[in-house]
């Protein structure tokens, strides 16, 4: 056994011992993090969150982020999706969040509400044109009540879609997170009218016990009614 292996096992043992000192809910989260290969892979590749791998999978499946693309990341903190957009060839990436985001080389990060009227002027200056991709991995603070959480995330998705309608270029793509439930019918009907293709996907990086899925709409048609 090498010194590196021994050291790695010792560090894991220390983290496990530390996790056992927390209350059960925190302990469960810490243990899950320790055993999650995507958490380890994110650290290894320098991504700020395991969610980065969800966008990688979605992009590989649907070809969302072309070279030179202009991308807007809504609810961007801590920045994993913004990092992926840059890595996959986007030329201009804007991350927007109410929370602070540590700087990311090559990206413009804005602390604020993407619904503010002032955002439109700022984006036009930064992007130099309409966005090719508007993406949102936003999620509400969950209550544990399935129906309530579903309605809350639908509210966020609708706000993101309204933003996309204002800022997407013809042929552009929209990606948003949802929780499984029955309230997305009207949104899907609208998307099918305004985009050439609308699909659902649950990336492998999504946890098995998670109700999340991603709605991916491509081929934006701004003049469709």
Curated annotation (Swiss-Prot):
Top-level class of the enzyme under EC nomenclature: transferase
Keyword entries, A-Z: Cytoplasm, Methyltransferase, rRNA processing, S-adenosyl-L-methionine, Transferase
GO molecular function: rRNA (uridine-2'-O-)-methyltransferase activity
Cellular location(s): Cytoplasm
Ribonucleoprotein is among the record's keywords: no
A cellular-component GO term for this protein: cytoplasm
Catalyzed reactions: uridine(2552) in 23S rRNA + S-adenosyl-L-methionine = 2'-O-methyluridine(2552) in 23S rRNA + S-adenosyl-L-homocysteine + H(+)
Primary residence: cytoplasm
EC numbers on record: 2.1.1.166
Residues holding S-adenosyl-L-methionine: 79, 81, 97, 113, 137
UniProt-annotated catalytic positions: 177
Gene3D superfamilies per UniProt: Vaccinia Virus protein VP39 (3.40.50.150)
Family designation: Belongs to the class I-like SAM-binding methyltransferase superfamily. RNA methyltransferase RlmE family.
Known role: Specifically methylates the uridine in position 2552 of 23S rRNA at the 2'-O position of the ribose in the fully assembled 50S ribosomal subunit.
Record protein name field: Ribosomal RNA large subunit methyltransferase E
Gene name for this UniProt entry: rlmE
């Amino acid at each position: 056994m090498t010194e590196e292996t021994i050291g790695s096992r010792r560090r894991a043992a220390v983290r496990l011992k530390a996790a056992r000192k927390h209350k059960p809910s925190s302990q469960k989260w810490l243990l899950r993090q320790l055993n999650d290969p995507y958490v380890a892979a994110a650290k290894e590749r320098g991504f700020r969150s395991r969610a980065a791998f969800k966008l990688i999978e979605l992009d590989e499946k649907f070809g969302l982020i072309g070279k030179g693309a202009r991308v807007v990341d809504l609810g961007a903190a801590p920045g994993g999706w913004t990092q992926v957009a840059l890595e996959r060839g986007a030329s201009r990436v804007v991350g927007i969040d109410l929370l602070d985001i540590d700087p990311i080389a090559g990206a413009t990060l804005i602390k604020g509400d993407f619904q503010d009227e002032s955002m439109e002027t700022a984006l036009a200056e930064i992007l130099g044109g309409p966005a090719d991709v508007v993406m949102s991995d936003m999620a509400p603070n969950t209550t544990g009540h399935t129906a309530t959480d579903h309605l809350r995330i639908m509210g966020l998705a609708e706000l993101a879609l309204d933003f996309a309608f204002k800022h997407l270029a013809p042929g552009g793509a929209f990606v948003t997170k949802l929780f499984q439930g029955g309230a997305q019918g009207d949104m899907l009907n609208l998307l099918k009218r305004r985009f050439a293709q609308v699909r659902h996907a649950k990336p492998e990086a999504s946890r098995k016990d998670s109700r999340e899925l991603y709605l991916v709409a491509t081929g934006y048609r701004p003049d469709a009614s």
